[in-house]
Regions:
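Residues that form generic nucleotide/phosphate-binding pockets
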Residues: 34, 117, 209, 232, ...
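Secondary-structure junction/capping motif
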Residues: 39, 104, 184-206, 260, ...
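Transmembrane and membrane-interface helices of multi-pass
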Residues: 2-197
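Short alpha-helical interface patches
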Residues: 99, 107-119, 205-214, 223-236, ...
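Membrane-interface segments at or immediately adjacent to transmembrane helices
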Residues: 174-252
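Solvent-exposed soluble domains appended to multi-pass membrane proteins
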Residues: 236-248, 252-255, 260-424
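Alpha-helix initiation and N-capping motif
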Residues: 108-111, 199-203, 226, 274, ...
Length: 424
């Protein structure tokens, strides 16, 4: 009868569940890549050109599926785990349709900023509603499936199964990861996070952002070690002095998405589109700057420039503004602003976007800036053609106002643009 065939099929799947888990893991991994890359053939190319990386990604998914052996509701948990991976891949695909940097664990810390940016080029209120509706529907389905769905009736190994799963998660994955990294199948650090996800797969890239929280604590780290380093530095340091009344004002501008059009070889121009920049380039010091991000993550370029600390010290996709600088045991961090303040400079930030975006209001106070003039404090009347971002014209007057506010001081002003923000 139908009931007997149903139970025989269930018994067959349970008997060979490890094999089916491997097949399911490969399917999930491929599906996630198709969604993330938004192209079926790109996913096929990834499997063909990075086969071992693809199989390693599938191994991570396989390990996550092994958790089902601890419970009777195995079918339900398989659906849940499958749904979670595909949901993460879908989020990544949506994000990559609006920016270059893929989805990472640190983006969860950006959720308050994201919800504050509805009806922008990033996403609309309608898109947010659809996402919430789909997630809610899936949760309702899961609840009903957990209540009404089948339960495992076979014998459970209450000791062997947990030990095997713990060994797989705690020993198997680290050893396999180390072997894959040593064989150059995957990389331990992504100089370019977008390229890393593309070459090594979303599952590994996202997992790295979860467990990779930056540099480990050095074995010899102690108060005595730090005191010895401080003594060594103090023995050779020199004091910075500037003649009174001759301190130069310093203006640092982060100009989003700016390039020299002449660097694009296939473009032909009837006249110089950026004559002022080229005049400065010809008459003063100039050069190229290597930055840790492309297409998103502006705050990490800021962090490197202002503090001198490399993003290689931090985890994959991490934003120090949203992590270390928000910890209570980090009252301050040395920066250009704090160093200039110590020799009498006034230090200011001017930015025509929301103060809380990337938690800049907190970060800049930790870096020692005296003032932060954000969008909320400006009289903004002009916006870009898309209507999403204020034009940067307002920053000229606001930068001058910041310097004029300290008549008897020289100033360091860090001005951040937003008009050229986002996709074109």
């Amino acid at each position: 009868c139908i009931r007997d065939r149903y139970y025989k099929r269930i018994a067959f799947f349970n008997k060979y569940s490890l094999i089916f888990h491997f097949i399911l893991a490969c399917f999930i991994t491929f599906t996630v890549e198709v969604i993330s890359r938004r192209d079926f053939f790109s996913a096929v190319s990834f499997v063909g050109n990075h086969t071992w990386a693809y199989l390693y990604n599938a191994f991570i998914v396989f390990a996550s599926l092994s958790i089902v052996y601890l419970f009777k509701t195995r079918a339900q948990l398989r659906v849940l785990i499958t749904g979670l991976w595909i949901f993460l891949g879908t989020v990544n695909g949506i994000i990559l349709s609006n920016r270059v940097t893929p989805f990472s664990y640190t983006d969860f810390k950006m959720l308050p900023d994201l919800f504050a940016m509805q009806n922008t080029n990033y996403f609309t209120a309608e898109e947010a509603t659809v996402v919430v509706a789909v997630v809610a529907s899936f949760i309702i389905f899961l609840v009903l499936f957990f209540i009404k769905g089948p339960k495992y009736q076979g014998k459970r190994h209450v000791v062997l199964s947990p030990l095997a799963i713990v060994a797989l998660l705690v020993v198997g994955i680290p050893i396999t990861t180390q072997a894959a990294q040593s064989s150059n199948i995957i990389a331990s650090y992504f100089a370019n996070i977008a390229q890393g996800y593309s070459d090594y797969g979303f599952v590994y890239g996202f997992s790295t952002s979860v467990v990779g929280r930056g540099m480990d604590k050095p074995d010899d780290y102690s108060k005595e070690t730090i005191d010895a380093i401080e003594t060594l530095v103090d023995s050779s340091k020199e004091e910075t002095t500037v003649s009174a009344g001759k301190e130069p004002n310093i203006i640092c501008i982060l100009l989003e998405s700016f390039i020299d059009p002449y660097d694009v070889n296939f473009l032909q121009m009837s006249e110089d589109p950026i004559p002022t920049f080229h005049s400065l380039e010809q008459n003063f010091t100039t050069g190229y700057l290597t930055v840790p991000v492309v297409g998103a993550g502006t705050a990490n370029t800021e962090f490197e420039v202002l503090t001198g600390m490399s993003m290689q010290y931090f985890g994959t996709g991490e934003y120090p503004y949203k992590t270390i600088l928000k910890q209570s045991d980090c009252p301050s961090v040395e920066s250009i602003a704090s160093d200039l303040s110590s020799i009498g400079y006034g230090t200011h930030v001017v930015h025509n976007n929301t103060a809380t975006f990337y938690s800049r209001n907190n970060a800049f106070s930790k870096m020692g800036f005296d003032t932060f003039t954000s969008k909320e404090l400006m009289n903004i009347t002009e916006y870009t053609p898309s209507g999403s971002w204020p034009t940067d014209k307002v920053l000229v007057n606001e930068t001058v106002k910041a310097m004029d506010a300290t008549e008897n001081q020289s100033d360091f002003v860090y001005t951040i643009t937003v008009g050229s923000h986002g996709d074109y």
